[in-house]
Amino acid sequence: MAILVRLFFALFVVSVYFFRVRLRLSHIPGPFLASLTNINRRQWVTTGRAHTIHTELHRQYGKVVRAGPNTVFVSDPAAIPAIYRFNEPYQKSEFYDALMPYVRGKSIPDVFATRDEHIHRTMKQPIAAIYSMSNLVSFEPYVKSTIEYFFSRLDSLFVETGKVCNFGLWLHLFASDVMGEITFSRRLGFLETGGDMENVMANNWKFFVQAAPATQMPWLDYFWKRNPLLPGSVKPNKVIEFGVARIQERLHLSEKHPDHVNSRDFLSRFIAAKEKNSQIGPDAIMTWANSNIQAGSDTTAILLSALFYHLLKNPTSLAALCTEIDAAAKRGCLSSILTWKETRDLPYLDACVKEAARLHPPISLPLERVIPESGTVIGGFKIPGGTRVAMNPWAVHRDRDVFGADADTWRPERWLEGEEKAKTLYNSLLTFGGGHRSCLGKNISYLEIYKLVPSILLRYEIGLAEPEKEWHLENRWFVMPSRFYVRLKARNGVTKL
């Protein structure tokens, strides 16, 4: 009898739990399993195709979809200002805990992943101005020197030999060395070796392969990956170790040969910011530098690859961009390596960059926020307090009501159909997040992209090595492309570097 009572009580508790969970968001459409468990959405991420799965979910169920017992996905661009606010912002959810740097058995708060608004403000305020475009243009000579070295490597390895170039890889190597130049006053050896220095890129990717599914069920990450009681669960962070080694090298260089150091590079400014603010924790310099290494090169490389890939897949668009660049060059308006100022007068280039940022946002998992206790209304649906609400940039950028019936296709001209429309489209982007927690480093990406793309097209004729084949995309937080191969030829009149 006692066993039956216990069994009945257990069934009662479980029934009440599932009844409550099921009904809490029952008015919001979505897959049935989503009302009972988060296993489904974890599995979506595990496939590496979450960006397309989430887009298909919205096409099937609408712009507001129940994705978990306490999670709602939204794809309506009109909801961006409400969810990703500048004033009275919604707090980030435990989703971000899996993305937090983990060193010496503890989480190290950083500007991006921390959920604590006070920590975020304390860490962001001293360095925010460094990332402004008005400041970043002072780094142009260092970006220019890396572009020149990049071109010399392309010339000797691919132009002169006729070999096929793994363009996605080389764009990644370029972006990694630019980050080294502006952060540590030196390239990190990626272009020189033509490969992954100390497996930094591979280790970074491995981190996100493990972290991405954990964002959907964070308690699993707490138990398996960050539990000091489990042997082997707390492992060294190879990417952070690489960054720490570069910091130590840089500090040693500044002591021995201060004239060899750019006193205005990111690391110098990070050190100065730390010295001026006693509230900043001891690991701040490490996490600031790590953010540049871990996120800065990936986002830039992905956007560069997306832009070139879609240009090469759309010859009419490529021809239009080359015509614009060549015409400006003939008027004497362009340097061989374009300056930021010179790129401001190339409207079709600007449209192509924005279209790449729309069609292929590098980060394409839903960016979660927590609805406050008072609740809210999104897309006509009441969302109770405590609900996790999120938007996947990939799905948002394919909203046909805003971006048109051809939202799934490459068409830069959509950005040139009037200032008001262009403004609406731009305000509908989540490429670098939204609100006061948007990505600090987005201007670094744009500086590199706007300088490199026209400079490459002035110098080379580029064609897909296998134009009949599609590239491969895998989403592990970053939607990383692979199998992007090209052939390069020097254009007439181009001199060897």
Swiss-Prot record:
Its EC number is 1.-.-.-. The keyword RNA-binding does not apply. GO terms for molecular function: heme binding; iron ion binding; monooxygenase activity; oxidoreductase activity, acting on paired donors, with incorporation or reduction of molecular oxygen. It comes from the Eukaryota. Glycans are attached at N443. One of its GO terms (biological process) is cichorine biosynthetic process. The chain crosses the membrane at residues 2-19. Disruption phenotype: Abolishes the production of cichorine. It is found in: Membrane. Cichorine and its derivatives are promising in the course of developing novel herbicides. It is a single-pass membrane protein. PROSITE patterns: CYTOCHROME_P450. GO terms for cellular component: membrane. It holds the Pfam family p450. Heme binds at C439. Cytochrome P450 monooxygenase; part of the gene cluster that mediates the biosynthesis of cichorine, a phytotoxin active against knapweed, corn, and soybeans. The first step in the pathway is performed by the non-reducing polyketide synthase pkbA that condenses one acetyl-CoA starter unit with 3 malonyl-CoA units. PkbA also catalyzes one methylation step to produce 3-methylorsellinate. The nonribosomal peptide synthase-like protein cicB, the cytochrome P450 monooxygenase cicH and the O-methyltransferase cicE are involved in the conversion of 3-methylorsellinate into nidulol. Belongs to the cytochrome P450 family. This is Cytochrome P450 monooxygenase cicH. It comes from Emericella nidulans (strain FGSC A4 / ATCC 38163 / CBS 112.46 / NRRL 194 / M139) (Aspergillus nidulans). The gene is cicH.
